[in-house]
Amino acid sequence: MQAPAARRMSRWLRHLVWIVPLVIFDIWFFGHRRGGGCEPPVSVEEPAAILEQEVAPETHPPWARLVYPTDQQGILQPGVPGVYQPTASGNPDSAMYGSVRTGSRGGRLVPTFHEGLDIAALRRDAQGRPLDEVRAVADGVVAHVNRFGGNSNYGVYVVLRHDDPIGRVFTLYAHLLSLAPGIQPGVVVKPGAVLGRMGNTSSSPIPMARGHLHFEIGLILNGQFGTWFRAKKLKPDHGACHGWNLLGLNPLDFLRFQKEKPEASFLDFMATVPSAFDILLAVRRKPDFFDRYPALWSGEQPGGAIVVACSENGVPLRGRAATAAERGQLGKLKSRIIRVHEDVLGRNGSRLLTRRAGVWVLAVAGEQWREMLLYPSLP
């Protein structure tokens, strides 16, 4: 006959047989339902497929019927109060594109780069929430949708792909409160199609009173970015539509250009964008970027090095093979800054470049940019 203590232990062990599996299931099930501290699921395959579809050579620019992304009609007048939403600083310039903001780094204040326009709300409800609809600016295809506000600094955001003679141009609509029904990758949209409602979603807090639309337009740096990103074991994974891979040009400059030349292509606009720096890069092959935007490449195939003219935030504006003399200047280096146009570089908020011993070189952010541009054929 078992002692009382032994009987109690026996009953406890029998209970463990069904308690342990239930506990394990509970942890797994509710962890997946609630996110469990993991990143919410995002679509990473569909955007890549949509962005890599071929653009027909006879494609016409999609901008002739361009509309503004909200009901705000004063977008070309940044000096008018209420058109753009500044940061907490109250500085109107902080809503614009460029090195217009100041942040803290290592205990000191440094310029930071803002890659789009922050368009203010025209209408709000009784609680102060924006009521403005956010709309597609031109004919396009939904390339990516992030439905989880905490999964990106962009919050809830939509990326559209637009077919232009230059190739695939993107527009991005960020900090949305909600998405319109049916907005998902692969959906074709027309100018003015409602994408969602303006909001203040983000992985970093934005007060409701400063809810706005963050709008970008630009090019995709590398079609294989998602593979590079996952190899680094980084999160969150938005595939090719991660913000690092979407390099925006000045939307206000583009909108002004398009108003003057509504039939022009994005390539025509890019011809007006000045270079901030020209860089000599060691390569194994021509970068994916110039395969997807061949009109930005001139001349023969590279023979081990290329020269790229870049905007302040690293948009490759033009590329060509390096000359023999330029290859000689590179030596065993992986990169060399040929020239810097300091009037264009300005406050250098992207910090792709830095001075060392009076010489311009790639900074840490610049080395990452080089790696993303050249992947998967890094020298």
Segments and roles (model prediction):
Residues 129-131, 135-180, 208, 212-214:
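Zn2+-dependent peptidoglycan hydrolase active-site motif and core
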Residues 137, 183-184, 189:
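Surface-exposed strand-loop junctions at beta-sheet edges and helix termini
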Residues 6-21:
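N-terminal Sec-pathway targeting helices
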Residues 22-32:
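Hydrophobic alpha-helical membrane-insertion segments, chiefly the h-region
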